[in-house]
Curated annotation (Swiss-Prot):
PANTHER family: CYSTATHIONINE BETA-LYASE, TRANS-SULFURATION ENZYME FAMILY MEMBER
Any one of the GO CC terms: nucleus
Disulfide bonds: none
Organism (species): Neurospora crassa (strain ATCC 24698 / 74-OR23-1A / CBS 708.71 / DSM 1257 / FGSC 987)
The organism's place on the tree of life at top rank: Eukaryota
The reaction(s) this protein catalyses: L,L-cystathionine + H2O = L-homocysteine + pyruvate + NH4(+); an S-substituted L-cysteine + H2O = a thiol + pyruvate + NH4(+)
Protein keywords: Amino-acid biosynthesis, Cytoplasm, Lyase, Methionine biosynthesis, Nucleus, Pyridoxal phosphate
SUPFAM superfamilies assigned to the protein according to its UniProt record, in alphabetical order: PLP-dependent transferases
Protein name in UniProt: Cystathionine beta-lyase
Length: 457
């Protein structure tokens, strides 16, 4: 059989045909094809979390893991969409487009941890820039800001960001960044983000309002919708939901701002790995059902503790001083709460007596965790500063998972009794605190009223 001349019409036709086929003889679009909607969200958020619009050339129902450091180019000039995974990877691109959709963002970027995300954001600052932030911050955030203050010439103002007037008094044309958390961790205080964003931009239109949305996730709150310029989250928490990866995400609407953040990620090499991008994408799909169960459990546990006389901090309780403000912005209360016992040693005994509640830092995973922030997650903040910021040394943080609520309450009850945190009565128990005594007295009065009224029924 003769071979057609390379210049013959038959040879040219063959080249055109086979240039479109892959090694298996398939003439299909490259993988991955662009994901996420082009015209905004089209379905309910719970649906969008699952619907990824993946168009793999082989019909894979899950996004492929492109575990490759380099990508071959079609010419000596390069120019292909991907060349080196530090700069970009198809798996990471799918994740980022999907996250942008659910975070109501124009662009989303993913990095190796939540603190990595904040590090990228703070590289927008230069010596002499002024930052306003809260007095109840995650310990890692406080550590990074302290470093920038002591070593990079950045001026950091810590104020009570739950008090808009306190923020207003500090804001000036020199303000470059306002960094907010809501709810705060672990005091569960609420910031009025729309108002703070407005007064910040009025003082300096170039200032950026940054919001750490880790405590709520995109399922419950979208800060970009209420005036924030940058939103970041620890993907390790609710987005992943299983504490088997570390990740951070950054969301913006401003294209120029997004380009600056991407430049830093590419330059420093902190982009999320392909495998972790795959795992985070998998976790995001179940965010709605996990958060629904975790919130329901957290609400029951918060009500249980409060009914027995403990001072509980949780925005799902109407006793929370900023209950109305929280619900004016958010779609849920989250699954992190804290309570006080009045005694550090007592709190330590409660934490160590728990069985189902794992003693650990972090939150947002399917299993429930218990900790003393002043001993663990916020230990990097010195005792003097904690006292100045009115952070109780005895405070216990509960990060509620998806277990059976009755089991969690039973285990917590046993820990409270074993630790000596409650006084047993014929009607149950109440906390050995002023609040607990008041609750017990109210219960006794109610019982007496019921007894007196009984004969007339």
């Amino acid at each position: 059989m003769s071979t057609p001349n390379s210049d013959s019409p038959a040879a040219q036709a063959a080249k055109k045909v086979f240039s479109r086929l892959d090694l298996d003889g398939h003439n299909l679009p490259p993988s991955p094809a662009p994901s996420s909607p082009h015209n905004g969200r089209r379905y309910a958020l719970a649906t969008e979390l699952v619907y990824t619009e993946t168009k793999d050339q082989y019909g894979a129902s899950s996004i492929p893991i492109y575990q490759s450091a380099t990508f071959k180019q079609s010419s000596s000039n390069g120019g292909s969409e991907y060349d080196y995974t530090r700069s970009g990877n198809p798996t990471r691109t799918h994740l980022e487009r999907h996250l942008a959709k659910i975070m109501n963002a124009n662009r989303c970027l993913s990095v190796s941890s939540g603190m990595g995300a904040l590090d990228v954001i703070t590289r927008l600052l230069k010596p002499g820039d002024e930052v306003i932030t809260g007095d109840d911050l995650y310990g890692g955030t406080n550590r990074l800001l302290t470093y920038l203050k002591n070593n990079q010439g950045v001026i950091v103002h810590h104020v009570d960001t739950t008090n808009v007037e306190s923020v207003r008094q500090i804001i000036s044309p020199k303000t470059t960044m306002v960094l907010l958390e809501t709810p705060t961790n672990p005091l569960i205080k609420i910031c009025d983000i729309p108002t703070i964003a407005r007064i910040t931009h009025e003082a300096n239109e170039k200032a950026v309002v940054v919001v750490d949305n880790t405590m709520l996730s995109p399922m419950l709150f979208n800060p970009l919708d209420v005036g924030a310029d940058i939103v970041y989250e620890s993907g390790t928490k609710y987005l992943s939901g299983h504490h088997d990866i570390m990740a951070g995400v950054i969301a913006v609407n401003d294209t120029e701002l997004g380009d600056k953040l991407y430049f830093t990620i590419n330059a420093t090499g902190c982009g999320l790995s392909p495998n972790d991008s795959f795992l985070l994408m998998r976790g995001v799909k179940t965010l709605a059902i996990r958060m629904e169960k975790q919130q329901a459990n957290a609400q029951r546990i918060a009500e249980f503790l409060e009914s027995h006389g403990f001072k509980v901090r949780y925005p799902g309780l109407k006793s929370h001083p900023q209950y109305d403000l929280h619900w004016s912005m958010a779609r849920g209360a989250g699954a992190v709460l804290s309570f006080e016992t009045g005694d550090v040693a007592l709190s330590e005994r409660i934490v160590e007596a728990a069985r189902l509640w794992g003693i650990s830092v972090s939150f947002g995973c399917v299993n429930s965790l218990i900790s003393m922030p002043c001993r663990m997650s916020h230990a990097s903040i010195d005792a003097k500063t904690r006292a100045e910021r009115q952070m109780p040394e005895d405070i216990i943080r509960l990060c509620v998972g998806i277990e059976d609520a009755d089991d969690l309450i039973d285990d917590l009850s046993r820990a409270l009794v074993q630790a000596g945190a409650v006084t047993l009565t014929v009607d149950g128990f109440h906390a050995n605190t002023a609040e607990g005594a008041a609750a017990a007295a109210a219960g006794s009065e109610a019982a007496e009223t019921t007894t007196t009224a009984a004969p007339s029924l």
